[in-house]
Amino acid sequence: MTSIDNRPLPFIYQFTAGAIAGVSELLVMYPLDVVKTRMQLQVTTKGHPAVVAAKAAVDHYTGVMDCLTKIVKKEGFSHLYKGITSPILMEAPKRAIKFSGNDTFQTFYKKIFPTPNGEMTQKIAIYSGASAGAVEAFVVAPFELVKIRLQDVNSQFKTPIEVVKNSVVKGGVLSLFNGLEATIWRHVLWNAGYFGIIFQIRKLLPAAKTSTEKTRNDLIAGAIGGTVGCLLNTPFDVVKSRIQRSSGPLRKYNWSLPSVLLVYREEGFKALYKGFAPKVMRLAPGGGLLLVVFTNVMDFFREVKYGKKQ
C-alpha cells in the first residue's frame, strides 16, 4: 500500500507540473473548446420565420455532435484543433498562476482570516481561487483573443501571428487586451467555484490513505468543481467570446455587464449559456484530469528530488 507523499517542492517543480497537466488536458479536450466558441458566437435570430430559417441554414449548430460533424465534414478534422498554438503557449504561465498563485494567496488570506492551527476554510479557498483567477486573466487575455479569432467560423486568419499583426496595426498593442474585463470575470468566478468546491468535496469524501484513493478523490472533486465553475462563469464566457471576436472603434459588445444584459434582451436567458454543454464536457472531466496529472507529476518530482518515500 502506497502512502500519500506531501513533501514540499520548489516553485519550478510546481510550474513544470502545472504546465504538463495543462497541456495534457488541452490536447485531449481542445475540440470541445472549438465547439464551445462556435456555439457562443452564434447569434440567436429573431424575426420572420423565413428569415430565421434562412440564417439558421448557414453554419447553424444545434448541438455538440452536430457542430463536431459539420466542422469535420466542411472544414476537415484539423479544424477541431484550429487556434491551439495560442493556448499551448499560455498553458505554462496559466497553470503556474492557477496552482502556485492559489497556494500563495492561501498563505496571504490565512494571515487576514486567522484559523486554529492555520487550517483552511472554504472562505479562504474561495478568496484564494478568485484572486489567482484575477491575476491569471491578465496573462491569458491576449492568448484568448488570438484563439477566439482563429476559432471563429468566419475567420480569415490562418496563423496566430496574422491575428497579432492585424490587431496591433489597427488598434495598437493594448488592443490585444480587448475583453480583459470579461476575462477577469470569467476566471474569478470559475476559480472561486472550482477551488471552493474542491475544498468542500474533499472534506465530504472519505479521507484518502493511498495514492489510488487520492486519485479517486481528485477526479471526483475536480469534476464537480469544474461543473460548478462552468455554471458560475458561462454568461461571462459568452460575452467574452463576442467581445474578443469584434474589432474596431464601433463594437456591439464592449463591457461585460451591459453585454450580458444585451444578450439576455435580444436572445433570451438560454443564450447566456450557449456552449455550456461542450464546456462542461471539457471542464468537468478536464478539471479532474488536471488534478490527477498535476498530482502524479508532483509525486514523480518528489521521488526524483528526495528518493522514493519509504
From Swiss-Prot:
SUPFAM superfamilies: Mitochondrial carrier (SSF103506). Pfam families: Mito_carr. It is found in: Mitochondrion inner membrane. GO terms for biological process: aspartate transmembrane transport; L-glutamate transmembrane transport; malate-aspartate shuttle; mitochondrial ADP transmembrane transport; mitochondrial ATP transmembrane transport; mitochondrial transport. Solcar repeats lie at residues 9-108, 120-204, 213-300. The chain crosses the membrane at residues 9-29, 78-97, 126-146, 179-199, 219-239, 281-301. One of its GO terms (cellular component) is mitochondrial inner membrane. The keyword Transmembrane applies. Transports C5-C7 oxodicarboxylates across the inner membranes of mitochondria. Can transport 2-oxoadipate, 2-oxoglutarate, adipate, glutarate, 2-oxopimelate, oxaloacetate, citrate and malate. The main physiological role is probably to supply 2-oxoadipate and 2-oxoglutarate from the mitochondrial matrix to the cytosol where they are used in the biosynthesis of lysine and glutamate, respectively, and in lysine catabolism. Present with 2840 molecules/cell in log phase SD medium. This is Mitochondrial 2-oxodicarboxylate carrier 1. The gene is ODC1.
